[in-house]
């Protein structure tokens, strides 16, 4: 039987040394599922609430004992005997138990841990890998996503003077995920050599990318291009570039305050700034180019470069189907970033991806800066219409774990494995 026998949660540590919640679900047939919840550094104001204890004498107030207790008491009792394969029903039960719009009573971290662990247990009960189990339910032919590899960290993810949060390489000119991963890895090591040659730091940030001090944001792009060439690849053909601007982090009093450029720009000026970069460099994707509340600026950017550049809403949409629908209706952005903990259940995550597909928007499944060894997002990326995955750089085990899971999935798919490559940017084909 695939009904739930027991649910248990515990407090563990994430990749930044902060507590997070891990949940385990055991079914009556003995099947077992485990999942750990990620946590973000730069967060949208409309994200589901991550419940923290606030006790400054313990883990600097970041403990999650309250969320753990909510799982081990309220949620465990309510879901005992529930059919684990009814993911939508299980998640509705969790949402109803919480009873708030933002999941702030029990905590989105409590709900998500149980939601994902239940899916793992249900897959085990069906004797399937999670990606197989999810694909059977989404009706999607599994495929390997293009990795958006964050090889230079800035902003809230690093202690340096770079304003933009992520500078990424996307290895699109390859026929398999494993070859794309190899190219990204070789570029990463080439970048380390280039940075050393320029006398720059090779210390890494939260997501495993290098975090040197540059004289300007554009110097980061130029350095990456040098590394791509040194690794033997061609920018614009083998490899494209991506940015996570995370502009909400430096949007102050109606202006974009670029410390690295010594500039304070209006929305119109910042759109010009980004459009100029997109014209000069092989940039295929820009995430959070404008601040989450600057919808007028977002619309300007979309109208300006949205036919040639993938414009990803992260803080803008926070994986929330209701907010995302506003973007679809207004023609704002052309892609959505999918973060499981922004919305708080697996079903709502899958619905956001399906919404994107119906609207002709691309979906990018993403990690958070505070990660664990959990690889659920890799399975989600393969089993849905998401065509890209963001899971950091090519070092730190919390990031590499997802890449390794994708390698396992590619091997399991065998001759049927398909890598998205240049076809990943579905919103640019409309």
Swiss-Prot record:
The lineage of its organism: Bacteria, Pseudomonadati, Pseudomonadota, Gammaproteobacteria, Lysobacterales. It catalyses: (2R)-2-phosphoglycerate = phosphoenolpyruvate + H2O. Catalyzes the reversible conversion of 2-phosphoglycerate (2-PG) into phosphoenolpyruvate (PEP). It is essential for the degradation of carbohydrates via glycolysis. The keyword Magnesium applies. This is Enolase. GO terms for biological process: glycolytic process. The keyword Lyase applies. It comes from the Bacteria. (2R)-2-phosphoglycerate binds at residues 165, 339, 368-369, 390.
């Amino acid at each position: 039987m695939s009904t739930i026998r027991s649910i248990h949660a515990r407090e563990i540590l994430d990749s930044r040394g902060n507590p997070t919640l891990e949940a385990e679900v055991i079914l009556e047939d003995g099947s077992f599922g485990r999942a750990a919840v990620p946590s973000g550094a730069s967060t949208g104001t409309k994200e589901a609430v991550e419940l923290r204890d606030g006790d400054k004498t313990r883990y600097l107030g970041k403990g999650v004992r309250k969320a753990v207790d909510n799982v081990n008491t309220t949620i465990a009792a309510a879901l005992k005997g529930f059919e684990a394969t009814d993911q939508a029903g299980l998640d509705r039960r969790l949402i109803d138990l919480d009873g708030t719009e933002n999941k702030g009573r029990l905590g989105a971290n409590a709900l998500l841990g149980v939601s994902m662990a239940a899916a793992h247990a249900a897959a085990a009960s069906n004797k399937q890998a999670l990606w197989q189990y999810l694909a059977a339910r989404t009706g999607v032919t599994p495929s390997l996503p293009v990795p958006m590899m964050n090889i230079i960290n800035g902003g809230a993810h690093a202690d340096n003077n770079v304003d933009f949060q992520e500078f990424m390489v996307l290895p699109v000119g390859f026929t398999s995920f494993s070859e794309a991963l190899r190219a990204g890895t070789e570029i990463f090591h080439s970048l380390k050599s280039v940075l050393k040659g320029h006398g720059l730091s090779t210390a890494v940030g939260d997501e495993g990318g290098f975090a040197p001090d540059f004289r300007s944001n554009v110097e980061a792009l130029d350095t990456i291009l040098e590394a791509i060439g040194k690794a033997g690849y061609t920018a614009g053909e083998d490899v494209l570039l991506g940015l996570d601007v995370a502009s909400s982090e430096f949007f102050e009093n109606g202006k974009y305050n670029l410390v690295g450029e010594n500039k304070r720009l209006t929305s119109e000026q910042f759109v010009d700034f980004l459009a100029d970069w997109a014209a000069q460099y092989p940039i295929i994707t820009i995430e959070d180019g404008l601040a989450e509340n600057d919808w007028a600026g977002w619309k300007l950017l979309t109208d300006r470069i949205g036919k040639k550049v993938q414009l990803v809403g992260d803080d803008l949409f926070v994986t929330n189907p209701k907010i995302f629908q506003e973007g679809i209706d207004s023609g704002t952005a052309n892609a959505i970033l999918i973060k499981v903990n922004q919305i708080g259940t697996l079903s709502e995550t899958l619905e956001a991806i399906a919404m994107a597909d119906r609207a002709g928007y691309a979906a990018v499944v993403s990690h958070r800066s505070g990660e664990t060894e959990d690889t659920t997002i890799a399975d989600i990326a393969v089993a849905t219409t998401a065509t890209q995955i963001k899971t950091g750089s090519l070092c730190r085990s919390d990031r590499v774990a997802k890449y390794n899971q994708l390698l396992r999935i590619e091997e399991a798919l065998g001759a049927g494995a398909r890598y998205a490559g240049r076809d990943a940017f579905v919103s640019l084909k409309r």
